[in-house]
């Protein structure tokens, strides 16, 4: 089970080289070790931010998805010696996890406010920790190797409504006892997240909350060359060249409200 990554887009947008070293090259090291030592199944935890990424974190997780899937297909085709089955799970925010909005809102309410929301229209998908764990384990059990499993996250939640509801449940009134302050979208932040790109379709599984994304297949050797190049760029802190390469390999990566937007115009 691989859940090691820098998951916060704010940190990775400011430290893109670390994002590539940990999220991309780190995943490759762990995946290669799994093959070397004959691990039966390798389950990678991905994110909805990997879909049509608008920030470094999302693109780095998409590259990690691409690597493990290409490695799995290379094993199936006999191009790489091994028996490990690689399975990817992709889902959104987990309620109550470190850095999630609910603990932050609770702290802000306890301190008398204001409760900060980046944009009045921003929406996110949520699931509970037990539900996320259960679906990851079930996807890992049903996977045969090379799949990207997408979870049914239910209806998206408007973050402003969540903030308002938490304030009311605390016995206070918005605008009277406590304010909601809109701070503006941060670099790389989307108004809404997607679980699938417009180029992906899904296939049903026997589980009503789990589907398989039908994604483009990448050649393992091409992916390996790309990751080697990205790793060298990151070690030498050649940020512009590194991000440019990320955008060329994942062409749907379009930066938003970020210093890297200029690379989309070249």
Regions of interest found by a model, annotated:
Residues 1-21:
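NAD(P)H-binding glycine-rich loop region in Rossmannoid oxidoreductase-like domains
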Residues 2-4, 42-47, 89-91:
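SDR active-site strand-loop-helix element
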Residues 8-10, 48, 53:
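Helix N-cap/beta-alpha junction loops of NAD(P)-dependent oxidoreductase domains
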Residues 31-32:
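A short, exposed helix-loop element centered on a Lys and neighboring polar residues
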Residues 36, 66, 70-266:
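Strand-loop microenvironment adjacent to phosphate/nucleotide-handling motifs in alpha/beta enzyme folds
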Residues 60:
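Active-site helix of classical SDR
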């Amino acid at each position: 089970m691989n859940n090691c990554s820098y998951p916060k887009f704010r940190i990775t947008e400011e430290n893109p080289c670390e994002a590539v070293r940990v999220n991309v090259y780190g995943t490759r090291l762990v995946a290669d070790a799994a093959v070397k030592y004959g691990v039966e199944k390798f389950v990678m935890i991905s994110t909805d931010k990997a879909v049509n990424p608008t920030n470094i974190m999302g693109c780095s997780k998409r590259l990690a998805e691409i690597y493990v899937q290409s490695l799995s297909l290379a094993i199936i085709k006999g191009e790489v010696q091994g028996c490990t089955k690689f399975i990817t799970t992709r889902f959104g925010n987990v309620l109550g996890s470190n850095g999630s909005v609910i603990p932050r809102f609770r702290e802000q309410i306890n301190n008398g406010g204001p409760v900060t929301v980046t944009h009045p229209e921003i929406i996110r998908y949520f699931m509970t920790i037990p539900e996320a764990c259960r679906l990851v384990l079930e996807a890992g059990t049903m996977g045969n190797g090379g799949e990207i499993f997408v979870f049914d996250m239910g209806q998206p939640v408007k973050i402003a409504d969540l903030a308002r509801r938490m304030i009311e449940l605390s016995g206070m009134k918005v605008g009277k006892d406590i304010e909601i302050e809109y701070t503006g979208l941060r670099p790389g932040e989307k108004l809404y997240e997607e679980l699938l790109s417009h180029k992906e379709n899904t296939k049903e599984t026997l589980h009503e909350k789990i589907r398989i994304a039908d994604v483009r297949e990448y050649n393992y050797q091409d992916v390996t060359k790309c990751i080697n190049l990205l790793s060298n760029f990151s070690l030498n802190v050649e940020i512009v060249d590194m991000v440019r390469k990320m955008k060329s390999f994942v062409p749907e990566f379009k930066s938003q409200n970020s210093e890297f937007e200029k690379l989309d115009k070249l």
